[in-house]
Every structure is written in C-alpha cells, then in structure tokens.
C-alpha cells in the first residue's frame, strides 16, 4: 500500500525520504481530497491485467508508453531529473503506473505544504490537472513506469508560478468545494 507523509524543509538530497519530525503521515482519504487517485495493481501482469484495462476504459486512458529512468537508460539523465523535480503543473492529469523500481511524487496540499508520496512497483497514481507537483527518484536511482494519457500524449510542464492558467483555477475551485 502507498505511503505518504508531510515533508521536512531540508534542501539536501531530494532522493532522501525527508519525513517531517514529528512524523505526520498522510492517508489515502487526504490524498483523495486533493484530487490524487491511487490504485495498487499487479505490475507483473500489466500487459494483460483486466483491472488495468477496466481503469483505462473508465477513465479514457487511451495512450500508453513506458519510460525507464536511470543513468544508463534515459538520455540526458541529469537534465531530465532536474526538470522532473522542478515544481510544476500540467493542463491534463498526470498518470503513472510503477512497473519496477521506486520514486517519490511530491504534491502541494491546500496550505501549500509538501506531501511526499512513495511510489513502488504496482502503485498507480493520477494527479489532477492544475496541482503543483514534482517527481524524483529515491536512493535506488531507478524506476520503470507506464505513462498513460487521455488522447494524444502531452507532457508540457508549466513551472510555478502558473496560477493564471485555467487548469490551476479549476483545481483551486475543486479544492474549495472539497474543503
């Protein structure tokens, strides 16, 4: 099951857990109130998983690819890692399914505090359009993930501040309604 927690304010190695002291765990319900959705699937059978197919059909995830993030597999690794960790939002949902390895998604809560979501094999997450977030590997420096999209793949990050964008405005309205 996924584990999430409020982060400390340390600015050292982002691949470390950065748990706030005292510990402040975050449950799935709190993530749901932020619009973050989570599923635990069997990554060993992702190619023929009826549960994954059901989710894809229900949520119209029509396009997929697989990305491997590691020094020896990803061209321009250092540049990409820095880009993924830059705080940003997207105009569409960001959907990731971890097939192997592990990493962290960080999302902002209603008070603009960081929540770290530990992702490992079998974890699938959907971040809503308009949420500020970032991604980093953990100390293992490796993840293989399925990227899912509604329609044609678009992965355009809008670095913070991007509060003027319609996706951000709609997300803030969603937060106000779910409070």
Swiss-Prot record:
Function, in words: Catalyzes 2 different reactions between oxygen and the acireductone 1,2-dihydroxy-3-keto-5-methylthiopentene (DHK-MTPene) depending upon the metal bound in the active site. Fe-containing acireductone dioxygenase (Fe-ARD) produces formate and 2-keto-4-methylthiobutyrate (KMTB), the alpha-ketoacid precursor of methionine in the methionine recycle pathway. Ni-containing acireductone dioxygenase (Ni-ARD) produces methylthiopropionate, carbon monoxide and formate, and does not lie on the methionine recycle pathway. Also down-regulates cell migration mediated by MMP14.
Subcellular locations according to the entry: Cytoplasm; Nucleus; Cell membrane
Record field: catalytic activity: 1,2-dihydroxy-5-(methylsulfanyl)pent-1-en-3-one + O2 = 4-methylsulfanyl-2-oxobutanoate + formate + 2 H(+); 1,2-dihydroxy-5-(methylsulfanyl)pent-1-en-3-one + O2 = 3-(methylsulfanyl)propanoate + CO + formate + 2 H(+)
EC numbers for this chain: 1.13.11.54, 1.13.11.53
This protein's UniProt keywords: Amino-acid biosynthesis, Cell membrane, Cytoplasm, Dioxygenase, Iron, Membrane, Metal-binding, Methionine biosynthesis, Nickel, Nucleus, Oxidoreductase
Listed Pfam families: ARD (PF03079)
UniProt membrane topology term: Peripheral membrane protein
Full protein name: Acireductone dioxygenase
Taxonomic lineage of the native organism: Eukaryota, Metazoa, Chordata, Craniata, Vertebrata
A GO term, aspect molecular function: iron ion binding
Family per similarity comment: Belongs to the acireductone dioxygenase (ARD) family.
GO biological process: L-methionine salvage from methylthioadenosine; methionine metabolic process
Major localization class: cytoplasm
Cofactors, names only: Fe(2+); Ni(2+)
Organism: Bos taurus (Bovine)
């Amino acid at each position: 099951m996924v584990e999430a927690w409020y982060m400390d304010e340390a600015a050292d190695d982002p691949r470390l857990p950065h748990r706030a002291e005292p510990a402040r765990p975050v449950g799935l319900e709190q993530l749901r109130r932020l619009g973050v959705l989570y599923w635990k699937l069997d990554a060993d059978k992702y190619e023929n998983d009826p549960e994954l197919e059901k989710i894809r059909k229900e949520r119209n995830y029509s396009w997929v690819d697989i990305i491997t993030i590691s020094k020896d597999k990803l061209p321009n690794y250092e540049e990409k890692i820095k880009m993924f960790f830059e705080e940003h939002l997207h105009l569409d949902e960001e959907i990731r399914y971890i097939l192997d390895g592990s990493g962290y998604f960080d999302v902002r809560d209603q008070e603009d505090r960081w929540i770290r979501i530990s992702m490992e094999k079998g974890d699938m997450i959907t971040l809503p359009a308009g949420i500020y977030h970032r991604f980093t590997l953990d100390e293992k420096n490796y993840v293989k993930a399925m990227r899912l999209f509604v329609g044609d793949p678009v992965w355009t990050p809008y670095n913070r501040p991007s509060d003027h964008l319609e996706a951000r405005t709609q997300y803030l309205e969603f937060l106000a309604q779910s409070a």
